[in-house]
């Protein structure tokens, strides 16, 4: 079934910033997709095209990207006569039209919006749920419900507190199902709210961009202590473990790291990569930390490789790998990490996201599907994580509708699968063993 019409528009994301939404029409109806956007972005990500007109949305408008879709991409895809089930051909056509390595001509936000809409239309054309269509595109016969990694304390570039490290997450690996994992996560989240309120007052329970609490604490170990206390208090010590996203590139200064980067600059307090690695070792020893994302700067390769060789936990590459096959290949070669953070808007098309996932899995890595801090009500990544069988997803706290949209969709998928539903649980790093 070929494409009849494509129309893009500018909408607002969960942070009140403009983003791209695409409507794609076939004989089967209308298929709509919206593109997310990050706050802490890796320098190697595909280019998100912003207008730069300071008189409008402080320069963050996306009318240029929208115009590229409506004026160039739409006519080309419609006249190609390609069917919406031909995801790879349609994605490749857009990449050829763009002609740049980082999608800087049209913008990754333009290409991705169309790519996501094509994928949804392709599922309808095949009369399949989106997650089954994605599984077929990836050549997967399995379908796995992921362990959710709930971001319950926000710091770094996602919050106005002094905390340097960006996310402190809970993973209900001991839950019996995805629905059960949601309950455990929500109960710990509410318990944590009480713990924070008792210690720091009601103001401290304000939430950050991803729905996590943002108490004004400085010590990262204090955040871990709060999370551990909430898990214990809720009665889930045996069922819930902790993950972190440090986003260390955000506080990398002159070859060192500044754990108080939101205060005035003072090079005397900077620490080395080795010292930071030792701090993580303490965290792993003292708390049930099983996953650390972006522990070092995106170009501090030596620190990554050294640390990954010395710990047995999951080390996730986000800014390091930016869902880019070339960066993933280098990280595999240098043994820099052992898990890929998969963000569709870092690479900019469904086909390339699937390829990046397969590349990581073929090299024995785990894969965690991820939202961005600037999200929309679009639920594509919920279907993506099931279809790609990655076993783990992070899409914020169990709070804020743009986060719950994804989690709720996953509960619907689990219900739809019925007896066929399998939950990754303790095997979240390697769900293929299920």
Curated annotation (Swiss-Prot):
It is found in: Cytoplasm; Cell membrane. Substrate binds at residues 158, 167, 293, 318, 370-373, 394. Mg(2+) 2 binds at residues 245, 293, 318. Mg(2+) binds at residues 245, 293, 318. There is a cross-link at residue 202 (Glycyl lysine isopeptide (Lys-Gly) (interchain with G-Cter in SUMO2)). The alpha/alpha homodimer is expressed in embryo and in most adult tissues. The alpha/beta heterodimer and the beta/beta homodimer are found in striated muscle, and the alpha/gamma heterodimer and the gamma/gamma homodimer in neurons. It catalyses: (2R)-2-phosphoglycerate = phosphoenolpyruvate + H2O. The modification N6-(2-hydroxyisobutyryl)lysine is found at residue 233. This is Gamma-enolase. It comes from Homo sapiens (Human).
